[in-house]
């Protein structure tokens, strides 16, 4: 049973799951909670937390990007207001959080970006000068690299707010994550999908993260059982490799960096690209690693190894001079 928006006090036997209050955050937290409930039989109580990123109207680059959606959730977890919290993994800082650990990463949804355009237009059909909205410096740089003649507009707001700007004629299109549209039942709004090879997405995009207090992930307690019920080893390895790029570059999530990792035929492949904000230049590095096994420890080791090699190549090629990378990690 899922109980939404309950008080911070624990209901007898209920597992309290913290979430942001946006429709997308609630939808994805409900999906994870339902999976935990099915696997464990636990009652789940959602605890809604308002974050600075939800209330501020500044752009992500002005806010500093990383941590604006995570800090309040982490505070609620440390204060005992909830037993675990659910983040969009792409919004979770890569630097360790004192007293907290990343306990589980469920199976990733579609990691691609989508175009949601007026009149069903595909990306190549947008006229010169068409206005395309995005709040992501990475997406803005990628769009400029592919179509320099587009008018890229910095926007904020939830999925419905962004889509409404297209339907109202304020914008010709917006770029949104396929995973978010799917979780909200709005994938029909997508008029085109960008391939990961031409438009690599934010490290961790499409994946969720379950964060807990340090120690709660171990043993056979209810929190550890909940984590084990939804953790997906290959998603965890792929996103660990992607996030190792951000960590190694000392970059925040507002940095114009795209990364894609996948496991195929026994190899863990990672490709990452750093973009100049105007889209006029970019650097790409790709490497692969062979895990000793597909156990969690060996996958994690391979992910960190391939991430370090990709970062080393990017930095040696001048990535730090190409784009503003520094940010809270």
From Swiss-Prot:
SUPFAM superfamilies: Periplasmic binding protein-like II, Porphobilinogen deaminase (hydroxymethylbilane synthase), C-terminal domain. GO terms for molecular function: hydroxymethylbilane synthase activity. Monomer. Tetrapolymerization of the monopyrrole PBG into the hydroxymethylbilane pre-uroporphyrinogen in several discrete steps. It catalyses: 4 porphobilinogen + H2O = hydroxymethylbilane + 4 NH4(+). One of its GO terms (biological process) is protoporphyrinogen IX biosynthetic process. Gene3D superfamilies: Periplasmic binding protein-like II, Porphobilinogen deaminase, C-terminal domain. This is Porphobilinogen deaminase. Its cofactor is dipyrromethane. Belongs to the HMBS family. Binds 1 dipyrromethane group covalently. Keywords: Porphyrin biosynthesis, Transferase. The gene is hemC. One of its GO terms (cellular component) is cytoplasm. Its EC number is 2.5.1.61. It comes from Leifsonia xyli subsp. xyli (strain CTCB07). The lineage of its organism: Bacteria, Bacillati, Actinomycetota, Actinomycetes, Micrococcales. The modification S-(dipyrrolylmethanemethyl)cysteine is found at residue 253. The porphobilinogen subunits are added to the dipyrromethane group.
């Amino acid at each position: 049973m899922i109980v939404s928006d309950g008080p911070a006090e624990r209901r007898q036997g209920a597992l309290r799951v913290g979430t942001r209050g946006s429709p997308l955050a609630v939808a994805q937290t409900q999906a994870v909670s339902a999976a935990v409930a099915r696997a464990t039989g636990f009652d789940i109580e959602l605890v809604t937390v308002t974050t600075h990123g939800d209330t501020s109207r500044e752009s992500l680059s002005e806010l500093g990007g990383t941590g604006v959606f995570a800090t309040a959730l982490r505070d609620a977890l440390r204060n005992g207001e909830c037993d675990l919290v659910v983040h969009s993994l792409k919004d979770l800082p890569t630097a360790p959080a004192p007293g907290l650990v990343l306990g589980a990463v469920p199976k990733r949804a579609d990691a691609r970006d989508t175009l949601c355009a007026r009149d069903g237009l595909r990306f190549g059909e947008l006229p010169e000068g068409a206005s395309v909205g995005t709040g992501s410096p990475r997406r803005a740089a990628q769009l400029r690299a592919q179509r320099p003649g587009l008018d890229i507009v910095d926007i904020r707001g939830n999925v419905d707010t962004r889509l409404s700007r297209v339907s109202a004629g304020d914008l010709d299109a917006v770029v949104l994550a396929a995973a978010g549209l799917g979780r909200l039942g709005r994938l029909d709004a997508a008029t085109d999908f960008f391939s990961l090879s031409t438009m690599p997405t934010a490290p961790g995009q499409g994946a969720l993260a379950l964060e807990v207090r340090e120690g709660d992930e171990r043993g056979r307690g209810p929190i550890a059982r909940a984590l084990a019920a939804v953790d997906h080893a290959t998603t965890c390895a792929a996103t660990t490799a992607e996030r190792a790029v951000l960590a190694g570059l000392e970059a925040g999530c507002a940095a114009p960096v795209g990364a894609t990792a996948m496991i195929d035929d026994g190899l863990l492949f990672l490709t990452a690209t750093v973009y100049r904000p105007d889209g006029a230049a970019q650097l790409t590095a790709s490497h692969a690693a062979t895990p000793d096994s597909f156990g969690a420890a060996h996958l994690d080791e391979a992910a960190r190894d391939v991430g370090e090699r990709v970062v080393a190549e990017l930095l040696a090629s001048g990535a730090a001079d190409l784009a503003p990378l520094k940010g809270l990690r």
